[in-house]
Amino acid sequence: MDNLKKTPLFELYKKYNGKIIDFAGWALPVQFESIISEHEAVRNAAGLFDVSHMGEITVKGREAFNFLQNLITNDLSKLKGNQVLYTFMCNYNGGVVDDLLVYKYSDEHFYLVVNAANIEKDYKWMKDNKGVYEVEIENISDEVAELAIQGPKAEEILQKLTDTDLSEIKFFCFKDNVKIAGIECLVSRTGYTGEDGFEIYMPNKYAVELWEKIVEVGKEYGLKPAGLGARDTLRFEAGLPLYGNELSEEITPLEAGFEFFVKFDKGNFIGKDALLKQKEEGLKRKIVGFEMIDNGIPRHGYEVRAHNQKIGYVTTGYFSPTLKKNIGLALIDSKYAQLGNQIEIVIRNKPLKALIISKNFYKKNYKK
């Protein structure tokens, strides 16, 4: 673990019996108590995640808006100050460089939150595509810690630590300079679990103190520290993509089923021509949800078959703690992608029957 990057909370993991793994070059807890108990805490009460490995990049300057509007697939013109936008950065072939959140302070100041595995790649991509735009791009990832408190009790717990009325921070909005336990933070009503909750950004030096305060206050509400394992099962049930699984440089937003975040009518952006061509010609493959009929747990990379031939592969698969079923997502040949179709997942060299169902396994409980 010595050669892995560590968040400011690393020393605290031991105290909470964190089981550490290598995630994209970071030493992070896959679980504390257990993946299932942490998952259930988030669905029913609250969970606290260390997500300080995520990247933060600021874009400032006279042409910050125009620069980003050309870089991303979603429409920045629909975003008001103190709102957050989910979007993709695509390459010229329409594949996904990354999926990210864009926080808008003003047309000349944006704050981007990107995936940990892609920080350096994204930063380089942005600089390489800066062209003549008058903007300053700064990677501040090493200075910022991030905690996520997620679950139906998240607001009630966090409210105990601040005088700011958190109910005024609406879904996909944020407020800066919010004092939580006396620490100035940026707080957004966002998350990656399908539940209500907040993501909290602060300087590294305050992360341990804030984590401990939230755990202390949250105990009586059933809050539990949660690791990457529960984070993955939660996002998966909610139909949220994971970069490297449902999204990649080779998988487009359209194939992943996220055309909603690709605004073809907004003017030009990188990847638009390729995506438009793909849309007009029709998708050759797409991501579908499936439920196992035979007994077996599907895993990332497992082969998917139909009529004795390979038609794709599993992108994510789990026993769902909420639904108590073995379910998965798979990228398959479009002609087999109709709801209700029977497919086979090859598990330990054995083709097992599965049924194609909606990808929205779990109804999201956001506070709009």
Swiss-Prot record:
Annotated catalysed reactions: N(6)-[(R)-S(8)-aminomethyldihydrolipoyl]-L-lysyl-[protein] + (6S)-5,6,7,8-tetrahydrofolate = N(6)-[(R)-dihydrolipoyl]-L-lysyl-[protein] + (6R)-5,10-methylene-5,6,7,8-tetrahydrofolate + NH4(+)
GO biological process: glycine decarboxylation via glycine cleavage system
Keyword check for Protein transport: no
Gene Ontology molecular functions: aminomethyltransferase activity; transaminase activity
Pfam families, A to Z: GCV_T (PF01571), GCV_T_C (PF08669)
InterPro entries, per database record: GCS_T (IPR006223), GCS_T_bac (IPR022903), GCST_C (IPR013977), GCV_T_N (IPR006222), GcvT/YgfZ/DmdA (IPR028896), GcvT/YgfZ_C (IPR029043), TrmE/GcvT_dom1 (IPR027266)
Keywords, ordered alphabetically: Aminotransferase, Transferase
EC number(s) per entry: 2.1.2.10
One cellular-component annotation, GO: glycine cleavage complex
Family that this chain belongs to: Belongs to the GcvT family.
Subunit structure: The glycine cleavage system is composed of four proteins: P, T, L and H.
Record function comment: The glycine cleavage system catalyzes the degradation of glycine.
Protein name: Aminomethyltransferase
Species assigned in the record: Thermoanaerobacter sp. (strain X514)
